[in-house]
Design a protein with these regions (language model features):
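Loop/turn-to-beta-strand initiation segments
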Residues: 44-48, 73
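Conserved nucleotide-binding/hydrolysis micro-motifs of P-loop NTPases
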Residues: 6-8, 79-85, 137-139
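C-terminal accessory "lid"/substrate-recognition subdomains
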Residues: 144-155
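Small-molecule kinase domains that catalyze NTP-dependent phosphoryl transfer to phosphate-bearing small molecules
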Residues: 93-144
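Short, electropositive alpha-helical surface patch
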Residues: 55-70
Length: 155
């Protein structure tokens, strides 16, 4: 499994991330690194799971290109905008997240608002099987059905 935030946090630790501008720069570098890793692993026949906040209209083409002939499936976790903001505030206030994300910076909050308003967190156009999971109160469908979906679509 490749988690985008783990890659970004490693870059933050190595290169420093004193402000939101640097965080955004490292975010772009992280996606470039993520796509490179995906391409290399998939071309070598390695199966993988990628955890990232891909954006409709931005990530679709890149993912299709790096996937090549690999079989892919998409699981989109979704909740209301209000719940996204509640979870975001809770996470930012917890102090558990890497400080390089600058979660409390006004620019970070504005970016989240723009992202939600732009409806970018909808299914990507990948021509692949899709499962939308409502995470408002647990997982609907539940974990067993999510695993079965992934298993069945990638056989």
């Amino acid at each position: 499994m490749i988690a985008k935030d783990e890659l970004k946090e490693s870059l933050m630790d190595s290169l420093g991330c004193p402000d939101r501008t640097r965080s955004r720069e490292l975010g772009g570098a992280t996606y470039a690194l993520l796509y490179l890793l995906m391409e290399r692993l998939l071309s070598a026949g390695v199966s993988l799971i990628v955890d990232a906040n891909f954006s409709h209209g931005i990530s679709d083409t890149e993912i299709r290109q790096v996937a090549g002939d690999a079989r892919i499936t998409q699981i989109l976790c979704h909740t209301s905008d209000a719940e996204v903001f509640r979870r975001y505030r809770e996470r930012a206030e917890s102090g558990d997240r890497h400080p390089g994300h600058h979660d409390t910076a006004p620019e970070t909050i504005a970016d989240l608002q723009i992202s939600l308003a732009g409806n970018r967190h909808v299914p990507l156009e990948l021509g692949a099987p899709l499962l939308i999971v409502d995470t408002t109160n647990g997982y609907q469908p539940g974990p067993a059905k999510i695993v079965a979906f992934a298993h069945d679509t990638l056989r």
